[in-house]
């Protein structure tokens, strides 16, 4: 009995320490306020509540909890040291108290508050499942039935709406999404509606399906990302719905707190960046396949024909959005294929692979038909496949590949640490649950996805956002782990053994603190909303449009109905969007591509005055054909950037690009 008690304390301490690390995710001390308030509230609530007709927790329970708190503080301190070293806040000779003190404060509060916080969260929403003798708290797979009720749909939509509205710069709560990549996608997408063919007429590097999605956003709003905001809400709703179904599959319980934790961890990660990335929009596609894989493994069955076709359809969509994310599917198919071959089901496997290929072909046919009709298949191959594989990447040797993978892991620890922690936690817990097949499946999916993303040697902040597809399973495993360890679950199990009524025991266990449950139903959603402001984008909430260079320059160009423009020295800063201008040159902005042709063409644009205007960020234009018209400055996440708008000083030249007028 004493050994079990020690194990229980250790589980509490590890849970608290793990959650403490999650609390320390934000890079800025100001973002730690919401987690600190959260833990303080939940430290006070559980131990101060009493139920009708029942006494408060006895002295022994308080003593065990106090011991667990002290042990948790020890673990929190150890994690804090490692964390500060990782964030380079601690050196060998000095300690930056000004930067580290807020982290230390939250570590102490988080270490103590995580125990009642995690236990309380699981009791706040008892769910609607029926307990069984096998599991009084988590009944496990609900027979494969994961139907989402109307109430759940409303909850999912509300969570998606609030999350995207707070975390994405595309939201109306923010003045403008100034992320250069999102503006590139929007510019190419709207150009497609005017007959401009990507790659052939307008050079960019992402997939054509991504541009088609942004083309759908243009009719909603020509000069803002209102359409992009709606697109992100739809993607978040689809992703969270599939995550919810996977949680129902593994636990059989409706736990709204699962949605809150999952949404907060995925969309406040620094890898989320500013919203509208290819990775963010592809999350529901990967989550669909991941959910089907989990269902096959946990229910011990094979993929159905419908599931195989939909997996192929989703992978085909990912192929034409950003094919470097296809590594997930390479790892995904290995475990199901091995199980079928081991059971002598080779013909069945071939049939399913054929259906997957049919799904890929179905997704690819419209893309190939579009470029074939415009006689631009060669441009599609050169720009999207060849240049990205052999020009954009740096992995020219095996050593460079290993360097790219190491750099990618360091990037994940900095910008998407929650995913790494939860993947490791998932693998350990699945292995201890004797579910080795599921652990192997998750491991292969993660390794192949991670490998294909970073093997090319390029490492950008937002690359790891697609790996957030593993967060829902990690949150589910964390909740299961804490649920098995909490004291109320033990009491419910003991009462069930005495009375022979596990249903009654489960119900009594959840009703021990009804006041806490009622308070939590109000407090938790509020704290979830506050936690979303830990997003790196929240600093833009106080910005006005009139202060942003994109709108300052757009005001200057508002009377120009036939203006031509190209973006020099950087990716699309957003003037094409705010001024509603169509690009008139193939290289409309400076891409992250070591291309001599692009540099040569842009020098030609500047030398011969091809466009009427040039906009630049942080780089001055030195050309006799242009003169400086306007300047502006804007502080982006603490860094001050100068912006320049140039106007053609001559009448142009015979090489000037034809103007493509907007209606």
Task: Walk through the language-model features, giving the residues of each.
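Short acidic/glycine- and proline-prone juxtamembrane loop motifs at membrane-interface regions
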Residues: 272-282, 460
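Hydrophobic, aromatic-rich transmembrane alpha-helices
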Residues: 43, 47, 116-117, 241, ...
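Transmembrane-helix motifs of polytopic, lipid-linked glycan transferases
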Residues: 230-252, 288, 292
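Short periplasmic/luminal acceptor-recognition loop of GT-C membrane glycosyltransferases, typified by
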Residues: 540-595, 602-621
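Membrane-interface alpha helices of multi-pass inner-membrane proteins
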Residues: 17-24, 306-325, 329-335, 362, ...
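Transmembrane-helix signature of polytopic, membrane-embedded enzymes
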Residues: 243-266, 300, 306, 440
């Amino acid at each position: 009995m004493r050994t079990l008690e020690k194990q229980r304390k250790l589980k509490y301490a590890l849970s608290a320490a793990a959650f403490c690390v999650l609390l320390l995710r934000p890079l800025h001390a100001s973002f730690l306020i919401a987690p600190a308030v959260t833990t303080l509230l939940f430290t006070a609530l559980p131990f101060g509540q009493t139920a009708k007709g029942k006494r408060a927790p006895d002295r022994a329970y308080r003593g065990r909890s106090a011991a667990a708190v002290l042990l948790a503080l020890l673990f929190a301190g150890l994690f804090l040291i490692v964390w500060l070293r990782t964030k380079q806040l601690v050196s060998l000779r000095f300690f930056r108290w000004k930067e580290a003190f807020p982290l230390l404060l939250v570590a102490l509060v988080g270490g103590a508050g995580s125990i009642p916080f995690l236990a309380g969260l699981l009791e706040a929403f008892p769910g609607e499942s029926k307990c069984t003798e096998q599991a009084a708290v988590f009944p496990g797979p609900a027979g494969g039935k994961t139907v989402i009720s109307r109430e759940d749909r409303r909850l999912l939509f509300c969570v998606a709406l609030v999350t995207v509205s707070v975390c994405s710069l595309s939201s109306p709560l923010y003045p403008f999404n100034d992320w250069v990549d999102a503006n590139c996608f929007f510019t190419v997408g709207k150009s497609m509606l005017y007959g401009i063919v990507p790659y052939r007429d307008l050079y960019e590097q992402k997939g054509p399906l991504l541009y088609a999605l942004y083309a759908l956003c243009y009719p909603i709003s020509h000069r803002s990302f209102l359409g992009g905001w709606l697109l992100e809400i739809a993607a978040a709703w689809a992703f969270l719905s599939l995550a919810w179904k996977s949680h129902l599959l593994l636990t059989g319980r409706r736990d709204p707190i699962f949605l809150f934790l999952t949404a907060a961890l995925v969309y406040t990660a620094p890898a989320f960046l500013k919203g509208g990335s290819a990775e963010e929009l592809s999350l529901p596609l990967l989550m669909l396949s991941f959910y089907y894989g989990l269902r096959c493994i946990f229910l011990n069955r094979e993929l159905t024909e419908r599931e195989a076709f939909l997996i192929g359809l989703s992978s085909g969509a990912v192929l034409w959005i950003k094919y470097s994310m296809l590594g997930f599917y390479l790892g995904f198919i290995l475990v199901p294929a091995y199980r079928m071959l081991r059971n002598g089901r080779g013909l069945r496997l071939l049939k399913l692979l054929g259906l997957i290929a049919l799904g890929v072909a179905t997704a690819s046919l419209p893309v190939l038909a579009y470029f074939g009709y415009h006689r631009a298949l060669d441009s599609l191959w050169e720009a999207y496949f060849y240049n990205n594989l052999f020009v954009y990447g740096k992995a020219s040797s095996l050593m460079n590949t290993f360097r790219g993978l190491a750099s990618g892991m360091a990037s994940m620890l900095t910008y998407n640490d929650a995913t790494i922690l939860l993947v490791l936690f998932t693998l350990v817990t699945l292995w201890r649950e004797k579910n080795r097949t599921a652990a192997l499946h998750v491991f292969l999916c993660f390794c192949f996805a991670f490998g294909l993303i970073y093997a090319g040697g390029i490492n950008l902040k937002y690359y790891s956002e697609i790996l957030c597809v593993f967060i829902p399973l990690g949150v589910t495993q964390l909740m299961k782990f804490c649920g098995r360890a909490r004291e109320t679950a033990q009491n419910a199990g003991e009462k069930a053994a005495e009375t022979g009524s596990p249903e009654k025991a489960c119900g009594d266990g959840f009703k021990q603190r009804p006041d806490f449950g009622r308070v939590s139903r109000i407090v938790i959603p509020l704290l979830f909303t506050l936690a979303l402001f830990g997003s790196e984008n929240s600093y833009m909430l106080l910005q006005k449009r009139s202060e942003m260079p994109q709108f300052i320059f757009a005001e200057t160009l508002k009377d120009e109905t036939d203006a031509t423009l190209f973006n020099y020295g950087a990716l699309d800063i957003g003037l094409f969007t705010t001024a509603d201008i169509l690009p008139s040159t193939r290289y409309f902005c400076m891409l992250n591509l070591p291309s001599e042709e692009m540099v040569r063409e842009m020098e030609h644009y500047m030398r011969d005055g091809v466009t009427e205007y040039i906009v630049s960020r942080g780089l001055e234009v030195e050309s006799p054909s242009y003169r400086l018209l306007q300047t502006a400055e804007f502080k982006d996440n603490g860094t001050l950037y100068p912006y320049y708008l140039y106007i053609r000083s001559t009448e142009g030249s015979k090489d000037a690009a034809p103007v493509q007028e907007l209606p």
